[in-house]
Amino acid sequence: MNNLKLSEEIKRAINELGYTEATPVQKAVIPVALTGEDIVAKSQTGSGKTAAFAIPIAEQVEWEENKPQALIIVPTRELAMQVKTECTNIGRFKRVKAAAIYGQSPFAKQKLELSQKNHIVVGTPGRLLDHIEKGSLNVDKVAHLVLDEVDEMLSMGFIDQVEDILSRLPKQRQNLFFSATMPEEMQDLIKRYQDNPMVIEMASEKTNPIFHVEMQTDNKEKTLKDVLITENPDSAIIFCNTKNQVDELTDLLDVKASKIHGGLRQEDRFRAMDDFKSGKSRFLIATDVAGRGIDVDNVSLVINYDLPIEKENYVHRIGRTGRAGKSGKAISFVKTNENPLLRDIEEMLDVTIEKKRKPTVIEVKVNEDAFRKKQQKRPTIKKARGEKLNKNIMKLYFNGGKKKKIRAVDFVGTISKLEGITAEDIGIITIEDHVSFVEILNGKGPAVLEMMRSRKVKGRRLKVNEARKR
């Protein structure tokens, strides 16, 4: 990573995030993206593609510009939040501000956020289009467009909305398209919206074994329990085709499991995802719609309780296992009438999905005790990638904003004059109508908090406190 031509602010962030060695897709994409060329990248899930586009975008945005300069379109809310977090972390020391816009979140609250300075906007197609049509998202200065998981947006029927958004963007812009597969409809999209793009096709790095278990009778629940006991994974994702099936399995399995599907409230979906990512839950039971936003390293087992209805989704599902060079395994339950779909998947992947027999009664009995002990063991909580980067940051709350004619430069001017503080110690600044939030970096938050209690901002004495987490 240190060999890339990046600013010191971006290099510092990626080092603190632990990006010491670039993945193959990052090595291929980042240098080309920094030149402004259009790119089509075929890359599997878990290959590091988010950083592959987030790094060059964070590098190229101009801090002084108030309107969004990059638009990143993704298929799901979970993915929108994850990409936004990644962009924020990578751009932390350059003070790059990113917003996540998606459905089932209050429109008015998003409108207020979009009225602030935002360098990058990440969102789902429908809600992005709503904001553009209503004038709350200005796209006049968008110079970088990313379509992430293009094949997923095609299969979910979002393409008309995506094209509507693209038709409203400036013609002169960089277009970066990322996809795990390359369906024919995507080729049409490339021809219409990209200018002689660099095509980057990454060979699959995965050597993770993939199997299928034949289901002769309707005994999938018992087989699932037996497979979990004999495999005894540290973590596993179980994919179902319906939310009812997700609910039933969550109740049926005698293990601590999180669940995620489109019928849950957004905060419950985020909480379930956080619990699984952190290791509080060893198992996650999910549908495809919700599962597309799952970005978790070190998942040791993926089980397709139901084969996906769309064969392309198989690629996304099994891409959740292993990741980043770690080993993993994928097992699919296949009924007799699903054999044609299994053959289609094998043809698409150009592999043979090996048949695996069901665990025997003896195998289950032998492994049952070890499985129970692992489930009862207190989980080791995993640290989030951005934890090291964010631990020396304090966000301050001030009780004044736009209505008092206060701007970001007023805070920068005042705080940078404090003893021992420079502009490099100031992070992202958010100015709302009646309040403002200022991030203080490098562990200097407590000192700034104390000194600002007796300082004025633009001639006004403002209340200042450490901001509550929102």
From Swiss-Prot:
This is ATP-dependent RNA helicase DbpA. Pfam families: DbpA, DEAD, Helicase_C. Keywords: ATP-binding, Cytoplasm, Helicase, Hydrolase, Nucleotide-binding, Ribosome biogenesis, RNA-binding. One of its GO terms (biological process) is ribosomal large subunit assembly. Induction: By growth at 3 degrees Celsius, and 3.5% ethanol, repressed by 6% NaCl. The gene is dbpA. It is found in: Cytoplasm. ATP binds at S43, Q44, T45, G46, S47, G48, K49, T50. Residues 30-200 form the Helicase ATP-binding domain. It catalyses: ATP + H2O = ADP + phosphate + H(+). DEAD-box RNA helicase involved in the assembly of the 50S ribosomal subunit. Has an RNA-dependent ATPase activity, which is specific for 23S rRNA, and a 3' to 5' RNA helicase activity that uses the energy of ATP hydrolysis to destabilize and unwind short rRNA duplexes. Belongs to the DEAD box helicase family. DbpA subfamily.
